[in-house]
């Protein structure tokens, strides 16, 4: 069905999102920081990346540029505990597919992943 990489330093969030996304039939990979996230991206080539904004070794907003440079056809969705309009705008400028707040948008995660997956799948098929 597709591959999703989750980059988040909160173990509970990683576990919860992995379970929810995995139950939808996606193959899920996890990373707790930017460095491991980049390694997972290169090794597993996911169509969609969910990335926390605040990571122990960097900013998810800045990481979007690196992820898109390495895998331009993969779609990145940023997650944050606190909605921040300037971060959201910068994330989109850096190439993010979307930017959502954790908790408030739990019911939006799966439809958003499905839309991002569809866009990435079409892009990969036209490559």
Predicted regions and their residues:
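Short amphipathic alpha-helix used as the core "switch/output" element in two-component signaling
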Residues: 39, 54, 61-72, 90
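Active-site beta3 strand of CheY-like receiver
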Residues: 44-50, 55
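Two-component/phosphorelay signaling modules centered on CheY-like receiver
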Residues: 2, 11-29
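Active-site residues of response regulator receiver
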Residues: 8, 52, 80
């Amino acid at each position: 069905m597709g591959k999703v990489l989750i980059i988040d330093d909160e173990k509970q969030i990683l576990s919860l999102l992995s379970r929810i996304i995995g139950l939808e039939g996606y193959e899920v990979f996890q990373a707790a920081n930017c460095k491991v996230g980049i390694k997972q991206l290169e090794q597993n080539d996911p169509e969609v990346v969910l990335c926390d904004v605040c990571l122990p070794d960097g900013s998810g907003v800045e990481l979007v540029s690196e992820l898109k440079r390495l895998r331009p056809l993969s779609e990145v969705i940023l997650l944050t505990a606190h909605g921040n309009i300037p971060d959201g705008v910068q994330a989109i400028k850096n190439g993010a597919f979307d930017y959502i707040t954790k908790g408030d948008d739990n019911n939006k995660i799966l439809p958003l992943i499905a839309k991002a997956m569809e866009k990435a799948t079409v892009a990969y098929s036209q490559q």
